[in-house]
Amino acid sequence: MSRYLVTGGAGFIGTNLVKQLVAEGHEVIVLDNYTSGKKPERVISGVTYVEGDIRNDADLDRVCPGVDGIFHLAALPRVPFSVENPELTHDVNVNGTLQVLLAARKHAIKRVVFSSSSSAYGGQAEKLLVEDTAIKKPISPYALHKFIGENYCRIFASLYGIETVSLIYFNIYGPYFDPDGAYALVIGKFLKQMKNNEPMTVCGDGENYRDYTHVSDVVRANILAMTSEKVGKGELINIGCGEPHTVNELVKIIGGKSVFVPERPGDVRFSGADNTKARELLGWEPTIALEEGIQQLKKEMGLVLKVRHLTQRI
């Protein structure tokens, strides 16, 4: 059994990760200020919840002693929110990540697994992005924050001997996602609109490609990244299915009416994962196809319409 700290452990991905860590018998501490996460109404038995801020040294000193590894998920997410609030999101996402790495060094914590984002790639012509060859060109503050975080992790591994791994997530969905709010993820937003008998609002022309990845696959990648002997030197590893779909195709899979609305600033055209590195270094591969994951969510939300399967794959 290991003792893990999960920053942002009350959020969407964090809650799923914490549940799995507990199921595997690990001791878990959650540090969260509940800005994006939920105060622990969804308390997981056996987990220590600490309300605090990753930018605060004293809060980190409360939770880091005796920890074997840190899953660093805490952030102010979403591209549009960062466009509207660049200073605040920089402070949390960049300075907060630096403070977590400094705390890991101070408390001699062996490994940090950092949650990055495919948005850090920026605008790319390729539909499947390769970690070590794509030249990253962030086009939003949030994307830049994650790019900086990746580089801080690499530097801390090389200069200070802190084992780090950066997992690059591609459009995650699944249980505990939040369908509410102006910055809700597209699948959650669409399913909520369907439940309310509203048309799905598609930004731009709907031909942006996204690589939708189920949160259970992301959780598995995190645990593998924490335990694999093949990583720890600041590696960048894509975590995505490798089968990008357009937003218009997503609408067809969900089923229902849609309307087009203006494109959002900061959105990239193509976002898909070449996951070869994850397979080779982590022994990871995706297990839940988009159609299956959508069907599961629709059942959870009481939506009985059946998934429509695509006739053409990308």
Where are these predicted regions, by residue range?
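N-terminal Rossmann-like NAD(P)+-binding domain of SDR-like oxidoreductases, especially those catalyzing
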Residues: 1-172, 300, 314
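Residue-level signature of the cytosolic catalytic core of signaling kinases
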Residues: 43, 56, 179-183, 243, ...
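Generic anion/oxyanion-binding catalytic loop in active/binding sites
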Residues: 49, 71, 78, 86, ...
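Glycine-rich phosphate-binding loop at the start of an alpha helix
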Residues: 76, 80-83, 143, 184-187, ...
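NAD(P)-dependent short-chain dehydrogenase/reductase
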Residues: 126-128, 151-210, 215-226, 242, ...
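C-terminal substrate-binding subdomain of Rossmann-fold SDR/epimerase-dehydratase oxidoreductases
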Residues: 195-314
